[in-house]
Design a protein with these regions (language model features):
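Extracytoplasmic/secreted cell-surface and envelope-processing proteins
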Residues: 109-116, 158-163, 186-188
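Mid-length scaffold segments of soluble, non-membrane domains
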Residues: 93, 100-134, 144
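Noncatalytic regulatory segments and standalone regulatory/sensor domains
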Residues: 57, 170-213
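Catalytic nucleophile-His microenvironment captured as a short glycine-rich beta-strand/loop
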Residues: 1, 76, 148-183
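Active-site-adjacent structural segments surrounding the nucleophilic cysteine of cysteine proteases
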Residues: 41-107, 185
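Non-catalytic cell-wall polysaccharide-engagement segments
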Residues: 1-44
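Loop/turn elements at helix/coil->beta-strand transitions in domains of secreted/extracellular proteins
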Residues: 125-129, 145-149, 172-175, 202-205
Length: 213
C-alpha cells in the first residue's frame, strides 16, 4: 500500500459526515492509514513470482461442456480451482478434471458456479479446508504465509460480468500476483502486479483461502 493510496483513503474518509481529524485523532492520519494496510510478516516468504501455481486458461477448453456452454464460456470457477488443486496436491488436475467429478451439480444456470463448489471440490481432491472471507487484510496475510486464494469478482478490471481469479502471492511491497483464467496476450495479467485495495478488493464479492502446501 503506497503513501499516495493512503492519502487518497484519508481524504475520502474525512470527507464523510462526522468523520473528522479532531474527533478521531490520528485514525485518518496518513501514516496511520499506511501502517494499517502494511502486511504483518509472520515468517511468510515473498518469492519473486509468488507461489508456483500452474496457469490454466479456460479458453483452451471450449470443447468441454459446462453449465449452459463450455468451460471456455462458463468455467472460470473450476479452472481457478484446478490451478490451486494442481499446486497443492502435486498432481496434474486439469479444468476438465475439476468439472468431470461433479458435472453441473454446482452450476446455477444464468449465474455461474456456486460458491459452495470450492469446499466441495477441495474435499474431493484432497486439498484440505477452505476459509471464506471478505476481509482484504486477511487475504494479504494468507498470501504472505503461502496460502493460495480464489477471488470472486464483479464488473471491473477483470470482468464485465462475474469472474473468478486466483491470487498466487504478494510481493515485498504489498502488490498481489494474479492467475486469471481468462488472461490473454493482450492483457498479460500473469506478468502484472496489482494493488489489492483499488484493483482487486474494490470489485471483490468474496475470497476463498486454501490451506498452505
Amino acid at each position: 500500500y503506497t503513501k499516495e493510496n493512503a492519502i487518497a483513503y484519508s481524504d475520502m474518509m474525512c470527507a464523510r459526515p462526522n468523520w473528522h481529524y479532531d474527533r478521531y485523532g490520528d485514525k485518518e492520519y496518513v501514516e496511520h492509514v499506511l501502517r494499517y494496510y502494511q502486511i504483518t510478516n509472520t515468517g511468510g516468504s515473498y518469492p519473486a513470482n509468488g507461489m508456483q501455481i500452474p496457469h490454466y486458461l479456460q479458453t483452451d477448453y471450449g470443447n468441454i461442456p459446462y453449465g449452459g456452454g463450455s468451460i471456455a464460456s462458463s468455467g472460470c470457477g473450476p479452472t481457478s480451482f484446478a490451478m490451486i488443486a494442481s499446486y497443492l496436491t502435486g498432481n496434474t488436475i486439469t479444468p476438465p478434471d475439476a468439472v468431470a467429478w461433479c458435472g453441473n451439480s454446482y452450476y446455477k444456470p444464468g449465474v455461474g458456479t456456486y460458491w459452495s463448489y470450492f469446499q466441495a471440490a477441495a474435499s474431493h481432491f484432497g486439498c484440505g479446508s477452505v476459509t471464506q472471507t471478505s476481509n482484504a487484510n486477511t487475504v494479504l496475510q494468507a498470501l504472505s504465509e503461502g496460502r493460495p486464494v480464489i477471488s470472486s469478482q464483479r464488473p471491473g478490471l477483470f470482468t464485465s460480468g462475474g469472474h473468478f481469479i486466483v491470487l498466487r502471492g504478494v510481493t515485498a511491497n504489498g502488490k498481489v500476483l494474479v492467475n486469471d483464467p481468462n488472461d490473454s496476450d493482450a492483457k498479460n495479467y500473469i506478468n502484472r502486479e496489482f494493488d489489492m485495495m483499488s484493483e482487486i478488493h474494490a470489485t471483490a464479492n468474496a475470497y476463498w483461502i486454501f490451506d498452505k502446501k
